[in-house]
From Swiss-Prot:
InterPro entries, per the entry: TLC-dom, TLCD
Keywords: Endoplasmic reticulum, Membrane, Transmembrane, Transmembrane helix
Any GO BP annotation: somatic motor neuron differentiation
Subcellular location(s) of the protein: Endoplasmic reticulum membrane; Endoplasmic reticulum-Golgi intermediate compartment membrane; Endoplasmic reticulum
Taxonomy of the source species: Eukaryota, Metazoa, Chordata, Craniata, Vertebrata
Record's keyword annotation contains Lipid metabolism: no
Record field: transmembrane: 26-46, 71-91, 103-123, 131-151, 225-245
Complex formation: Interacts with CLN5. Interacts with CLN3.
Record-given protein name: Protein CLN8
Pfam families: TRAM_LAG1_CLN8
Short sequence motif ER-retrieval signal: positions: 285-288
Length: 288
């Protein structure tokens, strides 16, 4: 089965021969390079323009740049995922086997992004001696899942694209964390963004239920089109998201709305220390 071609005469990125492994691997590498570039550009711009960034610890700067990179990927993923969920007639009519060239582009570049994300997270953990189990597991499963979709010409694209839609929360997470570090956690803008982010996490939970429904409704077609290890990986990852990761992150973000603390880097408060703290740190003047 070859990928379904989009209509149109003009040559474009969506009109490439995605049956070619060379094309798909090239776009995966391009995705890695592009998001590495976003990371580097964010560091350069923030170093030059942002006083808050310059005051951060090295590991916080890495997290800042990763948050911005994830936000850019989240915008791409949300747009692609919404179109697959609501607008594309080919994917809507065949949720198990339907393919589109524009989906191949997003699947391959997402593979490159998740490879970058895994490399960055592991290098950061190694250098700074930190470890976030949920984040590591989440991105490992994401990379392996999209790699499986990128190499399998028979795999349908609907579930892969709705998986991308799970990144809908990342732009809000980026804004939340940056404003938190700038000392704006009591501003109306931060609170509105936090409410929207929590809502996005609830939408993620609803979306995972929809993905389970698609799996049950189209089980035979999925089982015949996906390699068994890929299918098992997808189902196990979806189960982790549904039962553990999504509820945990939703709980933590709701806690953060009520108690604006940077729980990624906040140091344990010394016993008897009554000094008021903001964002897990001693309050300091707001700046951007």
């Amino acid at each position: 089965m070859t990928p379904v071609s989009n209509h149109g005469v003009a040559e474009s990125i969506f009109d490439l021969d995605y049956a070619s492994w060379k094309i798909r691997s090239t776009l995966a590498v391009a995705g890695f390079v592009f998001y590495l570039g976003v990371f580097v550009v964010c560091h350069q711009l923030s170093s030059s323009l942002n006083a808050t960034y310059r005051s951060l610890l090295a590991k916080e700067k890495v997290f800042w740049n990763l948050a911005a990179t994830r936000a850019v990927f989240g915008i791409q993923s949300t747009a692609a995922g919404l179109w697959a969920l609501l607008g594309d007639p080919v994917l809507y009519s065949n949720k198990a086997l339907g393919q589109q060239n524009w989906c191949w582009f997003h699947i391959t570049t997402a593979t490159g992004f998740f490879f970058f994300e895994n490399a960055a997270v592991h290098l950061s953990n190694l250098f700074f001696r930190t470890f976030d189990l949920f984040l590591v597991v989440h991105h490992l499963f994401a990379f392996l899942g999209f790699l499986g979709s990128a190499v399998n010409l028979r795999a349908g694209h609907y579930l892969a694209m709705t998986t991308l839609l799970l990144e809908m929360s990342t732009p809000f997470t980026c804004v939340s964390w940056m404003l938190l570090k700038a000392g704006w956690s009591h501003s109306l803008f931060w609170k509105v963004n936090q409410w929207l982010m929590i809502h996005m996490f609830h939408c993620r939970m609803i979306l995972t239920y929809h993905m389970w429904w698609v799996c049950f409704q189209h089980w035979d077609a999925l089982a015949s089109s996906l390699y068994l290890p890929h299918l098992a990986l997808f189902l196990f990852g979806l189960a982790l998201l549904t039962v553990i990761i999504n509820p945990y992150w939703t709980h933590k973000k709701t806690q953060q709305l009520l108690n604006p603390v940077d729980w990624n880097f906040a140091q344990p408060e010394a016993k008897g220390d009554r000094q008021e703290r903001t964002n897990g740190q001693v309050p300091r003047k707001k700046r951007l």
